[in-house]
Amino acid sequence: MILVVDDSPTDIELAIIALEATGREISVCSASDGKSALAMLRNGLGLPALILLDMKMPGMNGIEVLREIRSDYCLRDIPVVVVTSSALESDRTEAVAAGASDYLQKPLALDQFSKELGSVLHRWLPVT
């Protein structure tokens, strides 16, 4: 299962479509903010194989969520891919320093997003 965390319903839907286009059989859950995502992770969602995390969200931003995940013994080993519209190198550096497993910049065309996610899945969720 993959957890998509983004405050934009459109971006969540795009991520789901792009994941489906990779050809992998994957279940997807979503959360519209960081607090909801952490609650889902800590209260019975089950551990996802991968988290796609938006960086710029109201309330608890992606970096704060990522730090919470990395500081939680039960969650810290989950690969977290930051997916953000920020083109700033300082944001990439901050995400990596906070523990991001990978970093994708949006907006991407659907075919490009699917290709990028396919690479991410291959790297973090190899087919067995």
What are these regions (language model features)?
Residues 108-120:
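C-terminal output helix
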Residues 30-50:
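Acidic, metal-coordinating helix/loop segments flanking the phosphotransfer/catalytic sites
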Residues 101:
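Short, glycine/charged-rich "phosphate-handling" switch motifs in NTP-dependent
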Residues 1-19, 51:
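Conserved acidic segment of CheY-like receiver
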Residues 53-54, 84:
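Active-site residues of response regulator receiver
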Residues 57:
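Receiver (REC) domain active-site loop signature in two-component systems and cognate sites
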Residues 77-87:
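A short, hydrophobic beta-strand element within the central beta-sheet of small alpha/beta folds
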